[in-house]
Amino acid sequence: MTSAEIRQQFLDFFASKGHQIVPSAPIVNKNDPTLMFTNAGMNQFKDYFLGNETPKYRRIADTQKCLRVSGKHNDLEEVGIDTYHHTMFEMLGNWSFGDYFKEEAIAWSWELLTSVYKLPKDRLYVTIFEGDDKEKLARDTEAYNFWKKWIAEDRILLGNKKDNFWEMGEQGPCGPCSEIHVDLRTDEEVKAVDGKTLVNNDHPQVVEIWNNVFIQFNRKADGSLEELPDKHVDTGMGFERLCMAIQKKKSNYDTDVFTPMIDFVAKAAGIKYGADEKTDIAMRVMADHIRAISFVIADGQLPSNNKAGYVIRRILRRAVRYAYTFLNLKEPFLYKLVAVLADQLAHVFPELKSQQDFVAKVVQEEEISFLRTLDIGLSKLEQIREELKAKKATTIDGKTAFELYDTFGFPLDLIQLIARENGLTVDEAGFDTEMAAQKQRSKKAASVETSDWTIVTEDDEVEFVGYDHLISTSRIIKYRQVKTKGKDQYQLVLDTTPFYAESGGQAGDTGTLVQGDKKIKVLNTVKENNLIIHITEQLPADLKAPVDCKVNVLQRSLTENNHSATHLLHAALKQVLGSHVNQKGSLVNESVLRFDFSHFSKVTEEELKKVELIVNEKIRENISLNERRNVPIEEAKKLGAMALFGEKYGEYVRMITFDDSFSRELCGGTHVSSTGKIGFFKITSESSVAAGVRRIEALTATAAEVFVDEQQTTLAKITELMKNPKDLVKSLEDLLEERIVLQKQLDEYQAEKSKAIAKSLKDTVEKVGDINVIRAKLVLPSVDAMRQVAYDLKQTVDNLLLVLAVNVDGKPNIAVMISDNLVADKGLNASQMIRELSKEIQGGGGGQPFYATAGGKELNGLDKVIAKSKDLIQVHA
C-alpha cells in the first residue's frame, strides 16, 4: 500500500463515520500568539475546545502539516540521527466537538488499524492515564474499560502524566490520553523481550502511532485546571510512522514518503544510501528538512533572523552543512529537492506545486548566502578544536560560540552538533549570557504578563458590524489585565463591535468607548484566537452596563484608501509583470501602504510608471466596490478570486471586487465604497525584501499629493542651486563627471602619500623574537587611507605585526595587521587584539584574523592603545 493510499483510506474511513473532511491549516500559525508554527492537528480547532467559537461540524477529520522544532516540542537534535523523528510531519486526525467521546474514539481507532490497515493485533499495545495525586486527577478507568472490549488486559498499560496527559502548552486545552503503540520487531526479538517493557522507552521499533486525547480541562495561567463545558476528542496519528508500520519498514525514511528525495540526493552525491552511517544521516537530514523548509516558505514565512523566520533559517543551514561536510555538495543543491517534493505531494498539498519556482528560488538564495561563510566558519571551528586540544580542554566557551553565531551565522544547535561530532561540548549558559547581553544592547528584550480572563456575561457570540457601521452599543463579554514593560493595559472582548481587528496586513481601528460622561480610548484592536480584542488603559466604571463604541472615522477612512489601493496595485502588478506575481505580505494603515510580492528581479522605472498609470486610471474611473459576503469558497475560486498562500479560509469567504475584469480578491478588510475616494496613488520606493520577494511602498490621497509637492520643491531648490540651467540633467551629469575626475586625482595623491607614510614606518620596526612589530600613532584623512597604509606595509615587511592608532577627522580609529604566516603558524589573531585595544577608545570593532579595525569615542585613548599594544604583543608573541 502506497503512502498516498494510506492517507486516502484514513480520510475515507472517517468520512464513512460521518466526519467532514477539511483541508490542512497553514503550517505557519498567524492567529495564535502562543505558537509560531502549527505543531499539532488540534491547533486550528483550539477555539472550539475553549468555547470561543461554535463548530459548524461536530465531527471532522483531516491531515495536518505540522512542525516541531522549537519550544516544548523540539525534535531537531534527533532528526536524521534516528529513524523516526522529523521536523515537519503529517498528522492524521479525527475530531469530536461535544459529540462522541471515549467509547467511539477507541472503537474506531481499533477498527481502522486492525480491519482496514490489517495491523496484527498481537503487535499492538495501548496506554491509559494512571492518574496524578498532585493534580488530584483520578485514573482514566473509562478508557480502560472501553479498551477491554477490544484488546487483552495485559496489553493495556498505565502511563504517567508525562506520557498520558496531553497539554499543548503552559495554558490551554488538555486532558488524559490513550496512546496506541506498535511492535515492529522480528518474531525472534519479540520472543526474547516482552514488548510491553519497551513501550515509551525510545525503542526505534516499538513506537507510538496514534494518540487519542480526551479533552476535558483547560489549564489556566495560575496552573490550575478547570472543567470544559463540553467534552471533545482530539486524535493524532503520525502519518510517517503509520506508513512504516503498514509498509513493514524498519525506518520512516525507508517508506515511499522519503525514498524519492533520498534517491535523488544519493544519485547527485554519487553515494549509495546505506553504505555509511554518516552519509546516511546527511541524506535523511536533507530529505526531512526540505519538507519543513518548503512548506513553511509556501505558507508565507520567509527565512530571516527573527522568530519563525530564524527557526526555518536554522533548519536550512543545518541541512546545508550536512550536505557540505558529508556529501561533498559544495554548491547550492537543496533547492533542487523542492521540485521532487512538489511533484510527490501535488495531489494533497497543491499550494507547494503552485509556488514551486518561488520556493526553490528562496532556498537557493539562502544556500548561496550561507555557503559564503560556511567554509570560513568551519575553519574557525577547526582552529578552536586544535586550541582546545592543546589545552586538553573539551568545552567551547560561550563567548567563542556566540562569535560563531554572530559572525558566521552558525545557529547554536549547529555549533553543538559539530562540537559533539568532535567530542566537545558548548557552554550553553555562557552563550545565553552573551545573547542576553546583545538583546539588552539592542533593547529588544520585552516582558508581557497576562492574567486570566474575567467573565462578565455568559455569551460566546461575538459579532463584527464594522463593515456597515462605525458606531454601536455593546456589552463586555470578558476582560483581562495585561502588563507590558511595567505598564498596565486591559483587553476587552465585546458582544458587538464596529472596531476592525488588526489582520490581513490592515492595522486595527482606534477610537473610544463611551459610558455616561466617561470616554475611554481604544488604543488598538487586535485578533487573538479569532477573538476581537480591544486594548485600553482603563476599564468602564460599570462592567455590566452597555458602552457606546465609536471608531476613529478619519483613521479608518485613510486606512481604507490604502487598503483598496493595494488591491488595485496587486492587479496592476500582475498586468505589467506577469501572472507569477502573488502577494507575500502587506501593511496598510492611515499613513502608508506597503506591499510585498513575488518577483525575481528589480522592477524597472518604466514598469513602475506603467503600474502607477494603471492604478490612477482605475481611481479616476471611480469603480464602485462590489462586496460579497458568505460566498462558498469553491465558487469564489471559480470566479478567479485571488487567495493568499498561507492564509486559512473557511467554507465561506468575503470577496472584494473592483471591476469584474480587473481586481477580485478574498479579503476580510475594510475598503472604500468607490475607487475615486482614493484620490491619487504615488509609489515612493521599490526594494528587495528577500530572495524572490520585492516591496513597494506608496501613498494615497493627500499624503501622495504632499509627497509630490515636496519632490517639486526639492527639484526647484536644486535648479536654483545650479543657477537655473536650461538642461538641469545635463548640468548635473557634467558636475558629477567633474567630481569623478577630482576624486580620482585625490585618490592617486592619497595612495602616494600612504606609500610614503608606509615607507617611513618601515624604519620604526621593533624586533620581538622573529616578529617585526610596528606601532604608530598617525593623523590620516580617512579610514581607507589607514587601510592603504596597513596593506602597503604588509606587502613590504615580512613577519609583520602592525598596530596603527589613527586620528581621522577628530575620531579615533585603530587597525591591526598581521602577516598570514603568523596567523597560521603562531595563532595570532588581529580580531582578538582589536577587541582588547578598542576598550581604550571606548569603541568596538572586529574583522578577520589577519586584519581588523575599530572605531571609538575617546580620541585621547590613542596613546593608551599604543602603550597597551606593546603588552599585548609580548603576551601573544
Curated annotation (Swiss-Prot):
GO terms for molecular function: alanine-tRNA ligase activity; aminoacyl-tRNA deacylase activity; ATP binding; tRNA binding; zinc ion binding. Binds 1 zinc ion per subunit. One of its GO terms (cellular component) is cytoplasm. It comes from Cytophaga hutchinsonii (strain ATCC 33406 / DSM 1761 / CIP 103989 / NBRC 15051 / NCIMB 9469 / D465). Its cofactor is Zn(2+). It catalyses: tRNA(Ala) + L-alanine + ATP = L-alanyl-tRNA(Ala) + AMP + diphosphate. Its EC number is 6.1.1.7. Catalyzes the attachment of alanine to tRNA(Ala) in a two-step reaction: alanine is first activated by ATP to form Ala-AMP and then transferred to the acceptor end of tRNA(Ala). Also edits incorrectly charged Ser-tRNA(Ala) and Gly-tRNA(Ala) via its editing domain. Zn(2+) binds at residues 563, 567, 667, 671. The keyword Protein biosynthesis applies. Belongs to the class-II aminoacyl-tRNA synthetase family. It is an enzyme of class 6 (ligase). Keywords: Aminoacyl-tRNA synthetase, ATP-binding, Cytoplasm, Ligase, Metal-binding, Nucleotide-binding, Protein biosynthesis, RNA-binding, tRNA-binding, Zinc. It holds the Pfam family DHHA1. One of its GO terms (biological process) is alanyl-tRNA aminoacylation. Gene3D superfamilies: 2.40.30.130, 3.10.310.40, 3.30.54.20, Bira Bifunctional Protein, Domain 2, Threonyl-trna Synthetase, Chain A, domain 2. This is Alanine--tRNA ligase. Signal peptide: none annotated. The gene is alaS. Consists of three domains; the N-terminal catalytic domain, the editing domain and the C-terminal C-Ala domain. The editing domain removes incorrectly charged amino acids, while the C-Ala domain, along with tRNA(Ala), serves as a bridge to cooperatively bring together the editing and aminoacylation centers thus stimulating deacylation of misacylated tRNAs. It is found in: Cytoplasm.
